[in-house]
Amino acid sequence: MLDPNLLRNELDAVAEKLLARRGFKLDVETLRKQEERRKVLQVETENLQAERNSRSKEIGAAKARGEDIEPLRREVNTLGEKLDAAKAELDQLQNEIRDLALTIPNLPDDSVPLGKDDTQNQEVTRWGEPRKYDFPVRDHVELGEMAAGLDFAAAVKLTGARFVVMKGQIARLHRALSQFMLDLHTQQHAYQEAYVPYLVNHATLYGTGQLPKFGEDLFHTNPLSEEAESSQYALIPTAEVPLTNLVRDEILDEESLPLKMTAHTPCFRSEAGSYGRDTRGLIRMHQFDKVELVQIVRPEDSMQALEELTTHAETVLQLLKLPYRKVLLCTGDMGFGSTKTYDLEVWLPAQDTYREISSCSNMWDFQARRMQARCRSKSDKKTRLVHTLNGSGLAVGRTLVAVLENYQQADGRIEIPEVLRPYMGGLEFIG
């Protein structure tokens, strides 16, 4: 959520920047009319409150003098009714302003390249050389089925499309990947591991920006319920949601920052806008596992924190010896709440291309303002909004895809990366 003062004082400049850099058309006229009316109602409410207070004091004085106070009492009652009506209109208008503000994306950092879509992203660096194969390359689906470890037909029977049943050594490898990632981030990168709910309320989803704009991408547990919004839940699309909201409505000591958290969770996404895309295999699932990285930092530290967090995700790929590239997203490809994002794309031999395996973003104070997450300096005791960052460290299913395809042998066996062998009981090959 953008700073309301920015929208009030620099509305035209913000609208121009959003249109030029994001392709987002801000409804300037509506916002301007709402703000003008808000100012009028604010003054009217304050004047009515002051007049009502003044008349109420006169009642006491008149009563002490033995005068008839009934006319004054009627006047105070009338002022109270007008005040209640003005407050109600002001509250409704402020809610309308907030509802509109919640649909406005974050402003991109000036270092983000201009562009309309992913074709205009900028490659920053590459790591590792894709392996040359002297045999026909199999994709992860064929390899997983050869190892009797990926069963999509069973998942269709149990649930439907875009789900999978993993079995045997493939399931074990999937588990090993998540354990390896957690151990790396907690033991070498100083993240604190957390276990979080997989169901969250709507306030939590508003805090990180999934609501109100992306409600159709979520799995809601009771979408037709008439219960209060506070009792309605949705399955988490990423552990970023519960982890980041741990600081909602909190004031943190600046000396305690950065706060670095990680969690391994299943993630649930309806993929509402992805019909017909990546229908084969594990690339785009309704349910998938991910190890998430979240940092809560001082505002002046967030850009450096983005570089650090991205490096932490890169380390997973490097230790697994998986070729990848780092891409700086352009303005047209960034997420709704991000001010700057790096994507890490891993090499998939069967597709002969790089595919996203991690997205690392600096959200600036966009989420913090929604959550009212602040920090306080010990020296001057003043509070200010924190900055929040998040990234995949990594998506476990896509990492499994990359391991299966990059470590495949001519006979269909899969070599286990060296760093994973301690998690696999010393096993060197699957199949």
Curated annotation (Swiss-Prot):
GO molecular function, one term: serine-tRNA ligase activity
Pfam families listed in its UniProt record: Seryl_tRNA_N (PF02403), tRNA-synt_2b (PF00587)
Keyword ATP-binding: yes
Main location: cytoplasm
EC number: 6.1.1.11
InterPro entries: aa-tRNA-synt_IIb, aa-tRNA-synth_II, aa-tRNA-synth_II/BPL/LPL, Ser-tRNA-ligase_type_1, Ser-tRNA-synth_1_N, SerRS_1_N_sf, SerRS_core, tRNA-bd_arm
PROSITE patterns given in the database record: AA_TRNA_LIGASE_II
Localization (cell): Cytoplasm
Catalysed conversion reaction: tRNA(Ser) + L-serine + ATP = L-seryl-tRNA(Ser) + AMP + diphosphate + H(+); tRNA(Sec) + L-serine + ATP = L-seryl-tRNA(Sec) + AMP + diphosphate + H(+)
Pathway(s) annotated for this protein in UniProt: Aminoacyl-tRNA biosynthesis; selenocysteinyl-tRNA(Sec) biosynthesis; L-seryl-tRNA(Sec) from L-serine and tRNA(Sec): step 1/1
Binding-site positions, L-serine: T238, A239, E240, E292, S392
GO biological process: selenocysteine biosynthetic process; seryl-tRNA aminoacylation
SUPFAM superfamilies with a match to the protein in the record: Class II aaRS and biotin synthetases, tRNA-binding arm
Cellular component GO terms, alphabetical: cytoplasm
Origin: domain of life: Bacteria
Keyword annotations: Aminoacyl-tRNA synthetase, ATP-binding, Cytoplasm, Ligase, Nucleotide-binding, Protein biosynthesis
Binding site for ATP: R269, S270, E271, E356, I357, S358, S359
Enzyme class of the recorded protein, top EC level: ligase
Keyword presence, Protein biosynthesis: yes
Complex formation: Homodimer. The tRNA molecule binds across the dimer.
NCBIfam families, per database record: serS
Described function: Catalyzes the attachment of serine to tRNA(Ser). Is also able to aminoacylate tRNA(Sec) with serine, to form the misacylated tRNA L-seryl-tRNA(Sec), which will be further converted into selenocysteinyl-tRNA(Sec).
Similarity comment text for this entry: Belongs to the class-II aminoacyl-tRNA synthetase family. Type-1 seryl-tRNA synthetase subfamily.
Record comment regarding domains: Consists of two distinct domains, a catalytic core and a N-terminal extension that is involved in tRNA binding.
Protein known as: Serine--tRNA ligase
Species annotation: Pectobacterium carotovorum subsp. carotovorum (strain PC1)
